[in-house]
């Protein structure tokens, strides 16, 4: 048994300063005062927020694309995640040899026994045909509750294929998310840059302007609306993107959305850093302007967004990104961030924007659990829910650095950023796996059905 005493318990509708008792893997009692059972481990949480374990709905651990393989596999990635207070991740699984079922099986095998937090999978749809349509309900039966399509990259689907995909998914009730950038326009802008020889890093954001994001959001939302089915937009990065989501909702279209910490605290000036440092920040969508940052923060405070994902997709600076510094189109896109996601979002939203701890909790715990079929097993402090707990000391100020991070990448994009609030303790299904900021038990993660 574990009893957490006199913490500020972040419940779904209020803050309760009190105690929480975990027996085996479940929460069994929540009250202002709970007698300490014989033999129970006592955790003093005075001055700390006690959150339901954070859920990261957007990770790319152990991924290989056309340019490189990620620095972080399930082992290192989930260790970094849980040290950042994340007790559950949803990783992206891709098909194998054209098969969704085989792809899911392969990704489950890669993760089994190597994860230090709980996990489940989104299934990527990179082509649409009769076999894929036939396998969609099978992978849903096997635990997949969400699919992702791409409107960019070489494996993007056409509008008709996206329509067919949503039509096939609709009977299952699974969520359909999308990477929303106009791939054809990106290809055209990149081709123009290549003709002119403008391939330095500063051109990356110029080939993926915000209007390309908003156009794709409109198109994807329209396809969903044509089928009267809800859709989800991942990693919204711009004011234009937010505005388009609001326009779609005003039309009665069912659209949920996610943003990421990098778009709240980093901006496009990073692409002009000396000594090719800008390659560290190549990601898609790219970093935007301060104006976009402010719009995203306002949207978060005003309830436009449902979730905050890390989009952790790590590559090393020296060995993987830097070698393509003279051609931004060859730089592997993505950054580490699973460990820093929760505390950056906390500092920005709760400390800087005066968001309530309850509303913050919904973004990082409750809403992703509901969207992805894990609630109330995950995402809430309630009797009967899993004993997944993240304790944040509100008062500790610290500076984020690679030296204290646990990604296998050789940098973090948040180097030097000062935050107030630190993940102190983490409990995963009743196991006290992070104590005073140190990982004490590994590989206890289970696949979430």
Spans of model-derived segments:
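Histidine-rich, glycine-flanked metal-binding segment
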Residues: 1-3, 8-52
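Divalent metal-coordination and catalytic microenvironments
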Residues: 7, 20, 25, 47, ...
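C-terminal cap of metal-dependent C-N hydrolases
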Residues: 7, 322-327, 383-448
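Metal-associated gating/positioning segment near the N- to mid-region
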Residues: 45-114, 131
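A glycine-rich helix N-cap at a beta->alpha junction
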Residues: 110-125
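Histidine/acidic residue-rich metal-binding segments in metalloenzymes
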Residues: 134-308, 324
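His/Asp/Glu-enriched, well-ordered alpha-helical/loop segment
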Residues: 198-228, 302, 306-308, 314-394
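Short beta-alpha connecting loops at secondary-structure transitions
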Residues: 205, 280-283, 326-332, 409-413
């Amino acid at each position: 048994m574990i009893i957490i005493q006199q913490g500020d318990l972040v419940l779904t509708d209020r803050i309760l300063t009190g105690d929480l008792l975990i027996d085996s893997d479940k929460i069994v009692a929540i009250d202002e005062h709970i007698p300490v059972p014989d033999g129970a481990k006592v955790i003093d949480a005075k001055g700390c927020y006690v959150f339901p374990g954070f859920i990261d709905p957007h990770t790319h651990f152990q991924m290989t694309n056309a340019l490189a393989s990620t620095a972080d596999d399930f082992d290192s990635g989930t260790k970094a995640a849980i040290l950042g207070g994340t007790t559950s991740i949803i990783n992206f699984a891709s098909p194998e040899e054209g098969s969704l079922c085989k792809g899911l099986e392969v990704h489950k095998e890669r993760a089994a026994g190597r994860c230090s937090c709980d996990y489940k999978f989104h299934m990527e749809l990179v082509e649409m045909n009769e076999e894929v349509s036939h396998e969609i309900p099978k992978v849903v039966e096997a635990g997949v509750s969400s699919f992702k399509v791409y409107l960019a990259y070489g494996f993007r689907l056409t509008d008709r294929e996206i329509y067919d995909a949503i039509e096939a998914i609709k009977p299952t009730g699974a969520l359909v998310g999308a990477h929303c950038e106009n791939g054809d326009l990106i290809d055209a802008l990149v081709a123009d840059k290549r003709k002119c020889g403008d391939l330095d890093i500063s051109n990356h954001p110029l080939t993926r302007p915000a209007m390309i994001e908003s156009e794709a959001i409109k198109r994807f939302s329209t396809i969903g609306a044509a089928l009267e089915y809800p859709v989800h937009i991942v990693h919204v990065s711009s004011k234009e993107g937010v505005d388009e989501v609001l326009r779609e909702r005003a039309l009665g279209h069912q659209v949920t959305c996610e943003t990421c910490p990098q778009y709240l605290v980093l901006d496009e000036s990073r692409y002009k850093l000396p000594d090719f440092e800008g390659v560290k920040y190549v990601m898609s969508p790219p970093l935007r302007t301060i104006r976009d940052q402010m719009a995203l923060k306002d949207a978060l405070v005003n309830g436009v967004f449902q979730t905050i994902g890390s989009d952790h997709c790590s590559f090393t600076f020296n060995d993987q990104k830097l070698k393509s510094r003279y051609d931004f189109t060859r730089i592997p896109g993505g950054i580490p961030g699973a460990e820093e996601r929760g505390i950056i979002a906390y500092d920005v939203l709760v400390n800087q924007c005066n968001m309530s701890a309850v509303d913050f909790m919904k973004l990082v715990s409750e809403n992703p659990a509901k969207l992805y079929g894990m609630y109330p097993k995950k995402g809430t402090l309630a009797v009967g829910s899993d004993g997944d707990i993240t304790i944040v000391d509100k008062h500790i100020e610290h500076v984020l650095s690679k030296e204290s991070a646990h990604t296998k990448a050789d940098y973090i994009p948040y180097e030097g950023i000062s935050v107030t609030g630190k993940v102190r303790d983490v409990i995963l299904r009743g196991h006290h796996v992070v104590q005073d900021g140190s990982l004490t038990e590994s590989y206890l993660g289970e696949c979430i059905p």
